[in-house]
Amino acid sequence: MSEERKTKTDAAAPASAALQRIDRKDAFLQALHTFLTAHQGTEWAVAAVDIQHFKLYNELYGTEKGDALLETVANCLLGYSKQTGYPAGYFGNDDFFLCLPDEKAEQTAVLATLQACMAAGRQDVTFFVVMGVCPVQANPGADAATLCNYAQIAGVTTGSGYLHRFEPTMLNELKEQQQLLGELE
């Protein structure tokens, strides 16, 4: 195992097989940068995977079941990464990322696979997977971390459905919300 891979774990992460194998933030950002550099000219997207109501799930059923759910998502993403060769990563908490083609059909299929993987963990609390997608070619000059941030912003956008595509107007809305909050303080 390389030194980079050995250092990708952190104290806050639960110790489990898939969560130990999936790239952590720094390793994922490097892998994403390398992948996108090697595959220029192809339409790619960065996706942020968010487990809605995860904190509530953890509080109601305990961290052991929460960790098992995270393990399931990591395992599912590792399977996709192994099958396709596209990078996948885990930034801690319930924040997962992956690179995939900028094709809605592929993104919808990945989302459906994630939802199916998580179905066994469902209890009385409704939770689901939301995926925010940031198209790489629509954001020229954005580095790997910025692409992940944009995907994450898209993932928390309210609206119908479970697949949200990043639009630059989302940044303006976020800035306006932060300004309003600042004025309230």
Predicted regions and their residues:
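Catalytic core regions of nucleotide second-messenger enzymes
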Residues: G85-G92, A116-G132
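Conserved long alpha-helical elements within nucleotide-processing catalytic cores of c-di-GMP signaling
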Residues: A12-A45, Q52-L78, G89-N93, F97, ...
